[in-house]
Regions:
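Hydrophobic transmembrane alpha-helices and their immediate junctions
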Residues: 242, 347-386, 414-415
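Aromatic-anchored transmembrane helix interface
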Residues: 62-69, 84-110, 120-125, 129
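Alpha-helical transmembrane segments of multi-pass inner-membrane proteins
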Residues: 122-147, 171-221, 226-239
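A conserved mid-to-late transmembrane alpha helix and its immediate loop/hinge
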Residues: 167, 218, 329-367
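TM-adjacent membrane-interface loops and short helices in multi-pass inner/ER membrane proteins
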Residues: 283, 287, 294-336, 350-352
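A membrane-periplasm/extracellular boundary helix in multi-pass inner-membrane enzymes
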Residues: 140, 219, 237-293, 315-319
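Transmembrane alpha-helices of multi-pass inner-membrane enzymes
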Residues: 185-188, 376-386, 392-434
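N-terminal signal-anchor transmembrane segment
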Residues: 1-51, 72-79, 382, 398-400
Length: 434
């Protein structure tokens, strides 16, 4: 029982970071991510006192420099205009807040686990995803649960209720869907590369069930979730075929492929059963996978929201100065568009958008130097980042911040021989918690 309670508390802490919420009894600006970040700062200082020194890893410093340069450029873009929208002019503050929150998650998990590595992080991300999905179903079906959540948590419920949208505790609309998509990519990575999962049918089943749950319910919350599902499934299939040795199919590959197919068939059978027997579940699935049902029934792979996006929201600058420097306007109310590429160009110009893109390329790719077999995952995270910008401006730096803090896979000897690594900077974080 104690382990279950501890696991539940840690899941809530991670959820507060990944899916930030504001509380009705606190100022709106003080959300759960900031509270976790405050804990992270305190834990970081205490750890510095214990270690007799405060150290920042190379990626966090390089990332901070890049975020600062982007912020300065955005500040320059809004200077001299009548628009004083500082949403990205202070991105360095957002960067620091996410990083502090990530260290808070790392420190909280470190109170229980001797080594907070990628497996632990991914395991709790999966738990958080399932927790949010289950909570969303409870909120949507039980008035008492919805009343409790709406009373204590400020989630912009009026807008969600008007649109008849499902929501969890902080998981809603495209920002929630993008985080679900990221979690699905991380689950696919763990299922495909982690030895503990490879050698344990229970772990394989739990990962696949979590993947399916987040895909189905997460897509009802936000159809953006399906992007992560598609990337994750592609990764799992690629990984299964990469297990061949010398061009031959191995017994281990056959066993894993069989188990994967068996579990997926079970999930599909369960989904079909509930689709036919439950009108509520049927409505969920038809909304979450509207494009698929339109394709089956009409031959057109489309959704109503995508039609609006493509027909009305491609707004581009009308002069060279705005193309290069931007005009400091941002969002649906100022630019009449939600599309990320359009908003970035109108806000800070192509120069700013390129700077921001390079920042994420670095944050995703640098993880290859810290985690083994992470190359495909890095490129999937890059793909996810740039695909979702077709729809919204939300980014996924939260996962990079967590990966910066988690314990790496490589040996400390690798760290000491890294020619790019200054003497007092740690890249790999191979030390276990004490």
């Amino acid at each position: 029982m104690r382990k279950i309670l501890v696991g539940l508390v840690l899941t809530v802490v991670v959820s507060f970071y990944v899916f930030p919420i504001s509380f009705t009894f606190l100022p709106h600006a003080i959300n759960s991510k900031i509270l976790v970040g405050v804990f992270g700062i305190v834990a970081f200082i205490l750890n510095g006192i214990r270690e007799k020194g405060i150290y920042f890893s190379e990626p966090t410093i390089v990332g901070a420099v890049m975020a600062s340069l982007f912020s300065v450029w955005c500040l320059y873009s809004i200077t001299g205009t009548s628009n004083y929208n500082t949403i990205y002019a202070d991105y360095i503050v957002s960067y620091a807040t996410w990083l502090a929150g990530a260290y808070g998650v790392y420190a909280a998990l470190g109170l229980v686990y001797e080594k907070v590595d990628l497996e632990i992080i991914t395991r709790y991300l999966a738990l958080v995803g399932v927790f949010q999905c289950v909570t969303a179903v409870l909120i949507d079906n039980y008035g008492g649960v919805q009343s409790f959540v709406d009373r204590w948590m400020d989630l912009d419920q009026d807008f969600l209720h008007r649109g008849n949208r499902m929501y969890g505790i902080g998981a809603a609309l495209d920002p929630g869907g993008i985080r679900f998509a990221t979690i699905l990519v991380m689950i696919a990575h763990q299922f495909s590369t982690n030895l503990n999962v490879r050698n344990n049918s229970l772990y394989q089943t739990s990962d696949l069930v979590a993947f399916a749950t987040i895909t189905i319910i997460g897509s009802v919350i936000s159809r953006t979730t399906t992007i992560g599902a598609a990337l994750g499934i592609a990764y799992i299939i690629i990984a299964l075929f990469r297990m061949r040795r010398g061009g031959f199919v191995t017994l281990r590959m056959v066993r894993r492929f069989f188990w994967f197919i068996l579990v997926m068939i079970g999930i599909v059978i369960a989904a079909v059963y509930f689709y036919r027997s439950s009108e509520t579940f049927k409505e969920y699935v038809r909304f979450g996978f509207e494009a698929f049902f339109n394709w089956v029934e009409t031959g057109e792979f489309r959704t109503d929201s995508t039609d609006v996006l493509m027909e009305r929201m491609w707004k581009w600058p009308s002069d060279l100065h705005t193309w290069v420097f931007g005009q400091g306007t941002f969002g649906i109310y100022e630019n009449n568009t939600d599309i990320g590429y359009c908003n970035f160009t109108l806000y800070c110009g192509l120069v700013g958008m390129v700077m921001f893109s390079i920042f994420f390329l670095y944050c995703h790719l640098v993880q290859n130097r810290k985690y083994k077999e992470f190359q495909i995952t890095s490129w999937l995270l890059i793909a996810l980042t740039f695909i979702v910008w077709v729809k919204v401006t939300t980014d996924i730096f939260f996962i990079d911040a967590l990966l910066f803090c988690a314990v790496g896979d490589y040996e400390e000897a690798t760290e000491s021989t890294d020619s790019l690594l200054p003497k007092m900077m740690q890249l790999y974080n191979t030390k276990q918690n004490r």
